Structures are given as structure tokens and as C-alpha cells.
From Swiss-Prot:
This is ATP-dependent RNA helicase DBP3. Pfam families: DEAD, Helicase_C. One of its GO terms (molecular function) is ATP hydrolysis activity. Keywords: ATP-binding, Helicase, Hydrolase, Nucleotide-binding, Nucleus, Ribosome biogenesis, RNA-binding, rRNA processing. It is an enzyme of class 3 (hydrolase). It catalyses: ATP + H2O = ADP + phosphate + H(+). GO terms for cellular component: nucleolus; preribosome, large subunit precursor.
Length: 592
């Protein structure tokens, strides 16, 4: 009787040793599984050793504790003179308890190890997790020939085009501008067809493509006419084509534009890129029936839209942006000037949190910076030109002539200029004439037509159909003269506009810069002639600053009006207006 408990104790110890050996093998096997998972997620092997060591240590403690408890109970049973069967039963229960405790400890440690393995990569990439770059990382591979170019050539390209690239995320190797179309990664040579008429990418295209193809958020600050549409269009089409065919259904990209004319222009260029790839593009804007646009949205992959109409379609369920993970805000500064901030916020709220967001702007004021910080994650900022402050500047390739004259002499002087610049071999040269008000535009258009010139008009009183027809005729050269109000002053890419004439000075110097920006596009030179009268003298200081910044001659007659620059005022609230962001949380006040 006295020896039986000892033998049972030995049996129990032997069984525990056998189980321990089995669990150690299991632990090694699971260690390799954990190690493989850690390698997949980028963890160091040291972390694996720590997890395995702590696990074995915990298992050993649990087993020793259970064995000690079993031995103690066996001794107590022996002293009490219990029968063999109950003693064996108690020993078996003790061994069973030991095994259970060991399994419990093992499971606990495995769960902790799995939790550590899954949380570590999230912490390492917490910022990119809100952008498309997290899922698109590594999708762009630099062309071999581009990688082999001497750094001196890249530096010369950046210096020549006065390009500045600011990336808040440190990189082991900086992405090089795609300075030649052959370096652009395409899956099919037919995708290069839209570039057939160009010799090389524009500076904004060359600089932005590497970052956009890598899935990064980006802010592009560049003058109008710099080729921004293809800058965001090429990565847009490529991003959609990279998806499996069964996941391409629905709206995948949305481009927001401030005006109908600019939206149509973007649409035309994107169609040339998207249609050969089998992708559908739709353009939605107000002033036309909604039903055809609703039907088109159901089949569209890319939507180009003005803010108002797009929000209408979202509101009635006709446009679903829940899968639109490529978002472009074009002419962002102008959209804010036009009061579209809230509609923009509503549109972006309908898109996925995990998206790639792009913003193109001619200026970089605080309002645009605030908007970028709200919707973008670590955006790359690319500035073309020496205007690092982001203030509005005129294109230096445009020669600006300012004529100070009597208000009643405008029409006759306009007629002289038309005869001078549109006669003989230049009779088909495109000339854009700007007026301030709709009625003035109609009067000037009729005046020019009566003098025997072919002329069209574009202003707010015309229907969308007539505006589109006039613009198309002007672009195609059927009508070489176009009279417009500021509705056409920005964003329109009208090729080969030789001359811009400002019959009446606009309400702001910013509008003046955008007007004259219709010429001198795509690297070409242009000419702008502006009539300035005593009624405009309040803006003389601002105009003088624009002329000086572009190294243009300032007439003595203009200097007589003074160089004072008046404070920019709100159209409705004057100088008392204050821009307040209502979306920011109020300051919390606590009382003791």
C-alpha cells in the first residue's frame, strides 16, 4: 500500500514528461508558423524568438506547478491510507489538471502572439492606411533607362522648369520625373496614342506621374494651360485597369470642376484616354436635362462633374461614389472662390476613406491649404515655376500691353486692333475678347459682327447648347473671334489663341490673370491687350504688381492712378467679412 502512491507518482511524472516533449514539438511547429506570418508582415526574427521563449517559459511553469500539486495530493492520500483505486483516480485527475493548465497557458500565449503579429504592421503604416497608396504600394516601377540617366540630367530638367517637389514622407530613393513618354509604364502601346502629337511630357506631367502611379495624394500648383488634365488622367485610367475585371463596375473615379465649360474640356480629353481601354466617361453639369446624365452614370467608370449637379445626383441616388477611390479637385482655388467649399465636402464625404486624392490649383492660399489638410494624407506638393509662395502670377510667356484710354473710345480702339491682328494671312487667327457684363458682351458681339467679322459669343444668358456650339466653333476655327464674359476666363484649353483683348477690366486682378491665361498655353507665347479707364483706377495697384511680377512694362499713365492695393473684400459683406470654418469643433470651456 505504501509503495503504490510512489509508483503512481512516477507514472504521472513520466506521462507529464511525455506530454511536455510533445508540447515542445508543437511549440516549435507553431513558432515556425508565427515566424512565417511575421516575415510576411515585415517583422524582425528577434520578435519571433521572444514570443517562442516566453511561451516555453510559461508552459514549463504551468507544468511544474501541476506536477507539484499532483505529487502533494498523492502524498496526502498515502498518509491518509486511502485505497489504491481512489489514489490512482486522484493521480489521474492531477495529471489531467496539469495537462489542462498547460493547454490553457499555451492558448493564451498563442493569442497574444497573434495579436502582436497583426497589430504591428498596422502601427507601422497607420498614415498610408487612409489612402490608396497602402493597397497600391509598389505598383509603379521606374523604367530601366530612366533609372540609368545621370543625376545631372534630372537636376538640369528640374532647374530648367523651375520645379519644386516637397514630399513629407522620407524615401530611400527619390522618384525621378518621367521626362520622356517612352518611360511611361503602359500595358499596351495603344495607350501612348494620345501623346502622338507631343514631343515630351509637360513639367507638371513629368513630375506628378511617378507619385500618382505610386498611389500618393498630391497637390499640384501650376499655371493654367500646363497640361494638368493628362497629368491626372493617365494615372486615373491605369488605376482602374489595374483592378480585376469583375471589380471595375461602378464609378471608380470622380473629377470635380468649377464650371461646365472646364468639365466638358476635361471630359473630351479623358474620353481619348479611357475609350480605347474600354472605360466609360460621363460629364454631368447643370443647365441641361438630368435624365440622360442619370442613365449615363449607371454605366460610367469615370465621372467629370460640377459640384452642384453632382450633389443633386448623389442626393436622389443616381450617383454612387462609395467605390470612387480616385478623387480629383481641379481648379480648387477657384471652386473655393465661387463658394463651393461645402458642396465639395459633401461630395468627398460620399467617397471611401481609403482613396487617392488629388488637388490642382493655380494659387496656394490658406483656404486651399486648409482644404488639403482636411481631405489628404501626407500629400506631395509639386510647384511649377518660381512662385513658391503660391501667390497668383501671370504667365511670363504672355506679353502684356495696358492702354489707358477714355471709356467712350473702347469700341473704335477694338476695331483698330481687330483690323491689325486679323487680316491678310492672319485672318483666321483666334482672338478672345473679354467683357465684364452679359449685356456688354452682347453689344460688343453685335458691333463686331456688323463690321463684317465672323464672331461668336459665350455668356451666362445663353443656353448651354448655344454656349457649347459657340465654343466648339471657336475651337475648330470656324469662328475665329469669340466674345466672352468671365465664365470662360479660366480652365478652358482653347488651342492657338493668339490674342486676348480685355475690353473692360475685370473686378479683381486674379480674374485678370485668368483671362490672359487663355493665351500662351502649352509652352507657347501669347499677347494680351487691356483697356484701362479711370473707372478701374481702384485696381491700378494690383495690376501694377502683376505686371512687375511678370517683368512687363508699366505705362506712365497707369502709374498716375497710384500703386495702392486695396484690401480684398467679400462680394456681399465687404471688408467686415471673416472666413470661418464652421466644421471645426468649438472650444470647450469648463467652469470650476
Amino acid at each position: 500500500m505504501g509503495k503504490r502512491p510512489i509508483e503512481d507518482d512516477a507514472v504521472a511524472s513520466s506521462e507529464l514528461s511525455r506530454k511536455k516533449s510533445k508540447k515542445e514539438k508543437s511549440g516549435k511547429s507553431k513558432k515556425s508558423v508565427i515566424g512565417e506570418g511575421a516575415d510576411t508582415n515585415g517583422h524582425a526574427p528577434a520578435a519571433e524568438t521572444t514570443v517562442d521563449g516566453s511561451e516555453n517559459e510559461a508552459l514549463s511553469k504551468a507544468e511544474r506547478k501541476a506536477a507539484k500539486k499532483a505529487k502533494k495530493e498523492a502524498k496526502e492520500a498515502s498518509k491518509a491510507g486511502k485505497a489504491d483505486a481512489p489514489t490512482v483516480e486522484n493521480d489521474e485527475e492531477a495529471a489531467k489538471a496539469a495537462r489542462k493548465a498547460a493547454r490553457k497557458a499555451e492558448k493564451k500565449k498563442l493569442k497574444e502572439a497573434e495579436k502582436t503579429a497583426s497589430s504591428a504592421p498596422t502601427e507601422a503604416s497607420s498614415v498610408p492606411a487612409q489612402t490608396l497608396s497602402s493597397s497600391n504600394a509598389g505598383s509603379y516601377t521606374e523604367h530601366t533607362e530612366l533609372a540609368q540617366l545621370p543625376q545631372s540630367e534630372i537636376d538640369a530638367f528640374l532647374t530648367k522648369n523651375t520645379m519644386t517637389i516637397e514630399d513629407p514622407k522620407p524615401a530611400a530613393r527619390k522618384l525621378r520625373p518621367i521626362v520622356n513618354f517612352k518611360y511611361l509604364p503602359v500595358t499596351d502601346e495603344s495607350q501612348r496614342a494620345p501623346f502622338a502629337g507631343f514631343t515630351a511630357p509637360t513639367p507638371i506631367q513629368a513630375a506628378t506621374w511617378p507619385f500618382l502611379l505610386s498611389g500618393r495624394d498630391m497637390v499640384g500648383v501650376a499655371e493654367t494651360g500646363s497640361g494638368k488634365t493628362l497629368a491626372f488622367g493617365v494615372p486615373c485610367v491605369r488605376a482602374i485597369l489595374s483592378l480585376p475585371k469583375d471589380k471595375r463596375k461602378g464609378i471608380k473615379a470622380v473629377i470635380v470642376s468649377p464650371t461646365r465649360e472646364l468639365a466638358v474640356q476635361i471630359y473630351d480629353q479623358l474620353v481619348a484616354l479611357a475609350h480605347p481601354a474600354g472605360l466609360s466617361v460621363v460629364c454631368v453639369y447643370g443647365g441641361v436635362p438630368k435624365d440622360p446624365q442619370v442613365a449615363a452614370c449607371r454605366k460610367a467608370h469615370i465621372v467629370v462633374a460640377t459640384p452642384g449637379r453632382l450633389n443633386d445626383l448623389i442626393g436622389d441616388g443616381s450617383a454612387d461614389l462609395s467605390n470612387a477611390d480616385y478623387v480629383v479637385l481641379d481648379e480648387a482655388d477657384r471652386m473655393l472662390d465661387k463658394g463651393f467649399e461645402e458642396p465639395i465636402r459633401q461630395i468627398i464625404s460620399q467617397t471611401p476613406k481609403k482613396r487617392q486624392t488629388l488637388m490642382f490649383t493655380a494659387t496656394w492660399p490658406p483656404s486651399v491649404r486648409d482644404l488639403a489638410s482636411t481631405f489628404m494624407v501626407s500629400p506631395v506638393r509639386i510647384t511649377i515655376g518660381d512662385n513658391q509662395s503660391g501667390e497668383l502670377r501671370a504667365n511670363v510667356r504672355i506679353k502684356q500691353l495696358v492702354e489707358v484710354l477714355d471709356p467712350h473710345a473702347k469700341e473704335q480702339r477694338l476695331l483698330q486692333l481687330l483690323k491689325q491682328y486679323q487680316s491678310g494671312k492672319n485672318k483666321d487667327d483666334r482672338i478672345l475678347v473679354f467683357c465684364l457684363y452679359k449685356k456688354e458682351a452682347m453689344r460688343i458681339e453685335n458691333f463686331i459682327r456688323m463690321k463684317g467679322f465672323r464672331v461668336g459669343g459665350i455668356h451666362g444668358d445663353l443656353s448651354q447648347e448655344k454656349r457649347s456650339a459657340s465654343l466648339a466653333a471657336f475651337k475648330e476655327g470656324q469662328v475665329p473671334l469669340l466674345v466672352a464674359t468671365d465664365v470662360a476666363a479660366r480652365g478652358l484649353d482653347i488651342p492657338a489663341v493668339k490674342l486676348v483683348i480685355n475690353v473692360t477690366f475685370p473686378l479683381t486682378a486674379e480674374d485678370y490673370v485668368h483671362r490672359i491665361g487663355r493665351t500662351g498655353r502649352a509652352g507657347k507665347e501669347g499677347l494680351a491687350i487691356t483697356f484701362f479707364t479711370e473707372h478701374d483706377k481702384g485696381l491700378s495697384g494690383s495690376l501694377i504688381n502683376v505686371l512687375k511680377a511678370a517683368n512687363q512694362e508699366v505705362p506712365e499713365e497707369l502709374l498716375k492712378f497710384g500703386t495702392t492695393v486695396k484690401k480684398k473684400e467679400h462680394g456681399a459683406y465687404g471688408a467686415f467679412y471673416k472666413d470661418v470654418d464652421n466644421t471645426k469643433a468649438a472650444t470647450k470651456i469648463t467652469f470650476d
